[in-house]
């Protein structure tokens, strides 16, 4: 019996409906990521790709479990990739061990490796993340518009570097945040001896880059949540305010809100 092949182009390929852990050396560090091939994968048909980033200290296995994407149609149609943060942290946080775009380049390398083995729809590459992973998703949202069609940030840890040196291109953007979040408060603050941004500042960056007219439609959602859809944007911007604490929300159901938003978006 041979050991499982964990290289970036595994042989045999990952079977539809299953997930495997793969590894690559990236810029001198050994990096790891999970790849799940959709239940209905066909080499004839291009598949969207969804990257999912967990919080500080999260293993990709743990995030893949609580993200609950198995409750959505993503499990049927999307190649889902859960990368592991280096020492379980993502760039732009004060505790991160990666800097200067290192994690952005890592994600693009993963995409290239997966694209070499599977039929990827490069027009439908998405990112979602929780907490530190949400902050990193926002980094991708304003630095990797050439790669991603849409991003979704949940309870994001928006440390100041998240909105630094952003590219000006628009991006389909969903932000979900708890108005009672005590860890990453809605109004911003300090943590780990570093400042983090109010949600309105991060939102404002996306409203500016999407040339929105700053007005919005508001509608009530389950669990006392409020959805704000902004008007006049080049690409869609939506904010979901949830009256709970720092979490991956159950009401409204985060995986379905996220996938319903992301899956309809294209890069061009």
Identify the function of each model-found stretch:
Residues 181-184, 246-248:
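Acidic catalytic loop of the alpha/beta-hydrolase fold
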Residues 20-40, 44-126, 135, 139, ...:
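Serine-hydrolase catalytic machinery in alpha/beta-hydrolase-like enzymes
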Residues 1-49, 128-152, 158, 201, ...:
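A domain-start/cap signature at the N-terminus of enzymes
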Residues 51-55, 155, 177-178:
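The conserved beta1-alpha1 loop
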Residues 63-70, 157-165, 221-229:
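Alpha-helical scaffolding within the catalytic cores
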Residues 186-197:
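Short, flexible/disordered intra-domain loops and linkers
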Residues 172-176, 195-197, 207-268:
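C-terminal catalytic histidine-bearing segment of alpha/beta-hydrolase fold enzymes
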Residues 72-74, 166-169:
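Short, conserved loop/helix-junction motifs that constitute active-site signature segments
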């Amino acid at each position: 019996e041979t050991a499982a092949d964990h290289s970036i182009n595994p042989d045999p390929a990952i079977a539809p409906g299953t997930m495997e852990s793969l590894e690559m050396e990236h810029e001198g560090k050994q990096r790891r990521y999970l790849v799940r091939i959709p239940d209905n994968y066909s080499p004839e048909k291009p598949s969207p790709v969804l990257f999912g980033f967990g919080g500080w200290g999260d293993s990709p296995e743990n995030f893949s479990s609580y993200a609950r994407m198995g409750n959505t149609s993503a499990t049927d149609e999307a190649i889902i990739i859960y990368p592991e943060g280096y020492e379980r942290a993502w760039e732009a946080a004060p505790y991160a061990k990666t800097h200067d775009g290192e994690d952005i380049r890592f994600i693009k390398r993963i995409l290239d490796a997966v694209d070499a083995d599977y039929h990827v729809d490069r027009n439908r590459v998405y990112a979602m993340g929780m907490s530190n992973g949400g902050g990193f998703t926002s980094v991708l949202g304003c630095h990797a518009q050439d790669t991603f069609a849409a991003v979704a940030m949940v309870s994001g840890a928006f440390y100041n570097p998240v909105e630094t040196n952003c590219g000006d291109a628009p991006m389909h953007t969903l932000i979900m945040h708890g108005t009672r979040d005590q860890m990453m408060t809605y109004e911003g603050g300090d943590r780990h001896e570093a400042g983090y941004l109010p949600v309105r500042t991060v939102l404002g960056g996306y409203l500016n880059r999407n040339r929105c007219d700053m007005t919005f439609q508001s509608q009530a959602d389950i669990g006392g949540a409020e959805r704000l859809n902004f008007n006049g944007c080049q690409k869609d911007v939506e904010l979901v305010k949830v009256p709970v604490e720092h979490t991956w929300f159950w009401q409204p159901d985060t995986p379905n809100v996220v996938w319903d938003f992301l899956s309809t978006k294209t890069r061009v």
